[in-house]
């Protein structure tokens, strides 16, 4: 009797197919023992899986693409005692290389197909690179017909190909016969092998049809007999996997039937996965479909297999989806998660990658999760299917409705209310933007009524129409009655809301006891509304987004009124950002119980968003179902000098040029310098050190003033669709070009080197670093190089002069080096492209019009304009994030290494040679995307590790660097993550967690491994290993924000203990590895007690640390928490790293803040630029004053002179005060109020006379505001 063979099949992403494999096992039971494993078994390194692999006679593997899993699999093979036959398909090269079929093996790094086969496959698709994988599939069928002609010496390759052919037709019967073929050919089993039963590689399907349709024509003909004429109606296409159709098609049938029940005509199309784009391009393009829904996830081009060449997929998808020009959605069930996991945690990191991250690069929008696993089978949720159907109908309605009949809702913000923030958004002039949008819509044929003559008038109209105090009893005001409210909200929703906010209408905007006020401005078919506040001002604990929280009655009424009463065809949120997408619910994979989905799931949603924030835009896309329309950031400018600063700079320059004022007047000049420096409070910024020569002090003070003068600032706001001034474009492009480099040579360094000025400097970064330290030669060289770069950019790119001649001119006769010519030519080309994109910004408004027509706008990466250049241009695209598997990038790791080494060197120099034991680092999702992972690289380097790459170029894990190579101890790192990082980078968190655990397990002494030291201490105190190795903390799942900023803005705190307690409560959820946000307050506070330094990166020029509240509420609060728990010292330094320009700056928070206040808040160039934007600009000034108080609350780092100068600039100057009161009375009231609050809390020691004057001004402003309300 023949030996019973053991076959182990390992198939990735196959958890949904338990029923299929049970059937296959049963059918094969007489022939062999079959064990079926999944990628999860490899990931968890299950002992049962190890045994099955070692004991198998044959191993069959497919869809395994993680190096760690392959490495473990190979370990099991190496421990086996028997020879194995190994078939591996559709997996990473490291896996494919393990194939062993008789004498046939796959060469490492190859895909398994001989080169000749690849060439033939490419011929079959007419040389299209993007169709190469599809060509292989076509070739497979052709080759099967000629296999009998293959000579016996190629028998093993023939068998390998035949086995793959069976696998590509994955019915249970074909899979059983595949295994029987293996048994017959390699184990002499006497089994009968049936021929392959073929199914078309792609086609159309309907659950009511008896057979598959091999083309569109036959499907349309069949449909016509059923009364559906696809040529005379709107229709959508549904793409799904052929494999699922053959094996587990219930969810496909349910989706098709639900769509048809809602009256949607569907082209249900199946593909193997690699040829989805082929079907769209060759079959659907000519059918003029109105919507494309991809149920497969992954990329449209190449599917799970990706593309054959870098850039090929991007080019092909752009061509196809732009040509198709319809909305593109992804909707699919969870194939690797059960319902319990989904409803508790949202979508797993693995599924996030192919459901969200990859499709977003194609421009996919409005993702809907349709179901999950139950007992090894995909089960759909009817409510989710209905959501897909409703959205599909609304998208198609948007396309079908004429512009004159379309109703569009434009939503702006006012948070927190009462502070002059109505109709403001980050970086955007909202009133002017609104008017420009209305003017363009009018040209496009929309009914916009009678437009106001100016942005100011439009704001006045909107302000009055949304003012609760003025309008609540006006008959023309928009309100919702109790009866209507009961129609708009379901009984279950009302029950949840009433438990939180009491009975309708609640305490927010009630009109009597039977109505709630919405307000808003109607202009023809356009509605402009102000998003309701989150909760009750002054009580931030009511605002916390825990899972039990809900929107209040006015909030749900507002969005339901827009979607159902106003019956909007489209909803547009204007600017970054509102609150609705941050409402309670799952992080991803939202259900109808999640408030963002409940509020936004009934109307096509568009979001005008700055191109520099792809991380927060991801929340709007994934939770808010939004299509992003990006806009550029405001123009950049140099801060310049003002008031007495230019005179001091001249005095310092004169001192330096006269060789340190040698002669009789030396003491007088020195006294004049010190007097002016003290008058300007510059001795706080740049104090003279003990025993420091005066000439050295002058050099440091001079370079500090030059830094202030040349600091990049945004001193205006962007108007959607408009271009910035020429000078700003020159500055932006110059900074971008300076960031570029090749072979260690940047443009500034090439100029210096070619001009003969280099001397002993090895790089421009070295020159910049030395100049900041006061090195006289480096100062002069840096100034010369900066001017040379600017002139080169202006003359070659803007004036279009000959680059060779300009190069010679700026270098004083130097010739452009031959080896640098290709690099210089490339940056000139990039600069020219940037000029085109920045000078003609019409793409923004054109894209908005396009999406309102129901069309497709291209996707594009978001990021920093200076750092990324043309990569983020043109604006007006549907911005997306980055590939989490390639973080940090090689460049980011190099720069992160420099930052980490600089931090350690700085600490050692300041602490008598002692290394830091723990550094707390804030890591934001936005920073990670913009810098491609510099902050992550800092963590890796501090811990003494480096990335390990697989054959695809993905980072599989981080390897510990040997201590003898590292040359210092491993530093422990407490990572304070943003919730967006938590949502977007689950894979990265797992990799960082493994690094911590590897370091904790390393056989190294405590004095050389502080991670191990701290973990061992925690274990000795009774913590388990998971708790002891927790290093990544942020808010609980589904929660966003520390709320320290809200507590400060609402003045709802008494002392720093209140702020600290809130920070700890909100930020003690641990992540990474198996952690899913469990509270780990004990280890967090223990780690905080060991923190020696806090570090945070500033990722771009648009937002400095004084410009937004996130900095003080995260890294500022983190420093506060460390300071209150560290028993060794309270002097915990907070460092900010600026790496967005060509050199890296590392400064303490107090210095960074002084630079910010001097270059912006107190700088006429900045505030006059803001005031040109009227109401919005005044609101921006007011925000900065609130944030200043926030900084002082958590760090005590705002000097009295800053408060005094702020009061003198804005409140005590009658002319300025009146300007602000005219533009935005609530803004100036907030400015004065914050001054008084700072004094009242003891933060600002001011003269009593100044306080009394401010009190009088505040009372007068209050009276004026009350009088304005009374006038109405």
UniProtKB/Swiss-Prot annotation:
| Repeat listed as a keyword | no
CDD domains hit by this protein: CobN_like
List the disulfide bonds in this chain.
none
The record's annotation in InterPro entries points to: BchH (IPR011771), CobN/Mg_chltase (IPR003672), Mg_chelatase_H_N (IPR022571)
- Please provide the record's keywords in A-Z order: ATP-binding, Bacteriochlorophyll biosynthesis, Chlorophyll biosynthesis, Ligase, Nucleotide-binding, Photosynthesis
One MF term from GO for this chain?
magnesium chelatase activity
Pathway in which this enzyme or protein is active: Porphyrin-containing compound metabolism; bacteriochlorophyll biosynthesis (light-independent)
Q: Which PANTHER family match?
A: MAGNESIUM-CHELATASE SUBUNIT CHLH, CHLOROPLASTIC
Job of this protein: Involved in bacteriochlorophyll pigment biosynthesis; introduces a magnesium ion into protoporphyrin IX to yield Mg-protoroporphyrin IX.
Q: Which family does it belong to?
A: Belongs to the Mg-chelatase subunit H family.
- NCBIfam families annotated for this entry? BchH (TIGR02025)
| Protein name per Swiss-Prot or TrEMBL | Magnesium-chelatase subunit H
